[in-house]
Amino acid sequence: KIPEAVLRYLGNHKDLGIHSEMISDGIVDLMKKGVINNRRKTYHKGKTVATFCIGSQKVYDFVDANPHVEFYPSEHINSPVKIAKNDKMVSINSAIEVDLTGQVVSDSIGYQFYSGIGGQVDFIRGASLSKGGKPIIALPSTTRDGKVSRIVSHITEGGGVVTSRGHVSYVVTEFGIASLQGKSIRERALELIKVAHPKFRDKLLANVRKHYWVPEYQESSPSSVPELGTIEMKRFNFANINYMLRPLAPADERKLQEFFYSHNKETLMMRYNHHI
């Protein structure tokens, strides 16, 4: 559902390309608008390529004898090496839960199987290998009723890891983006707590403290900041440069240290009138 929802917000983009397992109504709509033209693809240029299609009748009518659409077996479309031939490949996959090390469960709820694994691992790996690629796991921060966090301290008993923590680079919820690539377990846990629902953050942090993944002094970030209008992130443009303004989060501790370490003694005294 999340990948399909993303398509609805791409109407103002241009020159997009598709290399996917599935063609759906959302892709057809963007192709008809000219948003998807595959002009800049570096593999299968000018073609939307997939393994199968599913959707309303308009999908089947659109792909029938369409010279701009090609279907290939899954061993071709899902090959990470072939996926990676597309520069700036963005792979967006959903998940049922993600633990604080970055392990992704996407096919089961505990012992109950919910779906198959599909091509998630293939496309996450392919996007990771792509020049400028972005492998993304996206999910709501809670279950539909809001009672259970989907960012969890440990995987639900019986749940299976589909995508390992070694392959996950970005996890996205409605509360932001957790960047995991190259991060330690401590940094990963703090990044993921940052994008969990605010009402679950303290509990998640307490659990990782218990396992000594983070120091005892570590605190969670505030759930809202009045200075920003109770939002957690704001984007703006100044002098033709894009900026992102957000509160400092626990995951930023090392960046803050490096910021201070970059100052010489004169700067420290002039800025803070104190040795740091």
Show which residues each predicted segment covers.
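Conserved GNAT-fold acetyl-CoA-binding loop/helix
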Residues: 264-276
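Nucleic-acid processing machinery
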Residues: 225-227, 252-255, 268
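Long, charged amphipathic helices and adjacent flexible linkers at domain junctions
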Residues: 217-235
